[in-house]
Amino acid sequence: GLVSTDGRYIQMMIIVGDEPMSQRSMDSVALARDALARYSDQMGWMAGTWVVGTPAILYDISDVVDSEFSWIEVGVMVLIYILLLLVLGSYLTPVRSLATIMMSVVWTLGMLQLVFAHVLGAEVVWIVPIVLFVICLGLGMDYDILLTTRIREGKVRGFSNDDAIRDALARSGGIITLCGLIMGGTFLTLLISGSTMLQEIGFALGFAILVDSLLVVPYVVPALMHLMGDWSWKGPRFLRRIHGGESD
């Protein structure tokens, strides 16, 4: 440790053997703060103690994110539901869109935990699920809206629900698959990085986009739209008139 010339300050350096963003490094910040607080109380010090450095900064950021991100998730999903309700004129289709995208996110989180935590013995960096949620919600919604609006166009042209689904898949399914392969493959190139965090981000985003574009959008979404039938397009009357005038 270092002592200031006036004897009022002491600086101690603690070196951990893990990456700054790892959970173990940030856990060491909490342990150090608790130990200093207990020692100060026992010794009766009238002094302040601070734990600083990259892990401490990241720990504080992680703490704020953990406490607020759940509300952000809810707010974003409510906003997206409202926008999709206005765009599609349907009560249930926006719910189906959000559910299928979250399905891809949940599958990816499970695979990420399996591969990195259980197989490779690494920790899943706390920021990876946040990045995954934000980017998948944007990219996955693009693919979903592209297919759903094509189905909607078929309904407006007078197709039955199943014929509209088949027509939409024939017109847009290949485009969605190609875009997913390009985007997913691009993210997967991060696996060659030497950084565990970049590897996890690349794997998570690449896997999620491939699952969404190769499985969820071409198969799960049409299957659910088939099961929902005409309920897919039930919505406010004024929006139904705007989007094609389907009857109840």
Residue ranges and their predicted role:
Residues Q11, L98, L132, I145-R152, ...:
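Re-entrant/interfacial helical elements at transmembrane boundaries that shape
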Residues D66, S70, V74, A99-T100, ...:
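Internal alpha-helical transmembrane segments of multi-pass membrane proteins, especially GPCRs
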Residues H226-D248:
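Membrane-proximal cytoplasmic C-terminal regulatory module of class A 7TM GPCRs
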Residues G1-L92, I101-L114, H118:
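Structured non-transmembrane domains adjacent to transmembrane bundles in polytopic membrane proteins
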Residues Y81-L85, L137, A170-K234:
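Hydrophobic, glycine/alanine-rich multi-pass transmembrane helices and their short helix-loop junctions
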Residues S90-A99, A117-F133, I192-F207, L214, ...:
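Membrane-water interface of transmembrane alpha-helices in multipass transporters/channels
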Residues G154-T177:
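Helix-loop junctions and hydrophobic alpha-helical segments within the transmembrane domains
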Residues T93-T148, M225:
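Hydrophobic transmembrane alpha-helices and their membrane-interface caps
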